[in-house]
Structure formats: structure tokens, C-alpha cells
């Protein structure tokens, strides 16, 4: 089975998402630039990010902050989000089981895939970190997806674009392919993904098929 992260892998959302989150932080009086959000929180659950910001700042975010961010994100995604280049091509040849496992909420996963016409490849196999106790880099989400799909972790390949996501896949006992083809990917991201445990790194989703064959012989 192939397990895909959503943001930054299937949809080119990371730059848009960090811009939205940063804007809402600044409106709430917290000076977090998009670069800071991307550097420290890419791949993390929003709830974990908000909790860490409150601890670091020594004060609470507004009580409706999570809802404000979620509402702004869904609106902008419906209007602006695009699929990662060649995502549909890469998915079209995958005949075996596949799913999405994302740190995002169920609503955001669904909106992301509907807006980019990728949901047809996955529904109903959409898994959110909201379903588990611990988000990435803990393995809980990937193990939950494998258990629900009735596939052994050792038979799973994870496609991830963040070091915390790669670490989660490795901790789950899965083979991880790093992806650096999103518009947010910096020059050192590939090295960071390898350091976190990715067995291979690709910059074009058209290379996914040959990479899986090289790693697993599928």
C-alpha cells in the first residue's frame, strides 16, 4: 500500500497554508512570519503548533483562533489551491491500495482533494491526525491507516515532504520516499528528509513508479 501525505505532496499547499497561518498569528498579536511557521511547524498538527506557540510566547491565543484559521484556510483553498504537478499522472498507474494520511483536519483534507480533483483516487480512504492521540512525528497516524486498511506496516510505502512526516513513517516501520517537488521546498530539504530516514528522494511525481519498483519491486 502507498500512503500519501496531502499537503506539499498531492497538493501544492504549503506556501499558501503558511501564509494564511502567519497572517492570522499576526492579527492575533503573535509575530510569526511565514518562514518561521514553515521552519518549525511544517507537517505538524495545527493543535500541536498552537500549543507550542502559546508555551513559547507565555500567553494564550484567542479562544476562537483555531476556528478562524480553519475557516480562512478552507476558503482560500477552495479559491486558490492547485494539485502538485503530475499528481494525477502518478496516481493513475497505482492499482493497489492507497490512502491519504495527513496532519490536517478531515475537512481540510477533503476540500484539498476536491478542489484539485484528486479525491477520486482515494475516497473513502482519508485519514487525519485528529483521529489519533499523537500527531507526527509519532507513528500513530500511519499505523492507524495501515490497521484500518488491513495492511502490515512493513508492506507500506509512505510519500512525505517533511522531516517530521518521514520520521513518523520510519517509526511506523514503513519505507519512506521523500518528495521535494513542492513550490515550498528549499535546497536543503532533500538532505533533511534523508537524514530523517527517507530511503529515496524525488522531485517529480512521475518518478514515483520507478522509485517504488527500485525499492520494493512492485
Residue spans for each PLM region:
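Active-site neighborhood of HAD-like aspartate-dependent phosphohydrolases
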Residues: 1-39
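Conserved SAM-binding loop
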Residues: 10, 98-101, 158-159
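Hydrophobic alpha-helical core bundles mediating ligand binding, dimerization, or RNAP-core interactions
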Residues: 17, 21, 25, 50, ...
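Helix-loop "lid/cap" segments that line or gate small-molecule binding pockets
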Residues: 24-25, 45-60, 112, 146
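Short helix-capping segments at alpha-helix termini
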Residues: 27-31, 57-61, 117-121, 150-151
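Metal-dependent phosphoesterase signature
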Residues: 31, 51-89
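Short, acidic loop-to-helix structural element flanking the phosphoryl-transfer center
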Residues: 75-100, 106-110
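Asp-based, Mg2+/Mn2+-dependent phosphohydrolase catalytic module
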Residues: 88, 92, 105-218
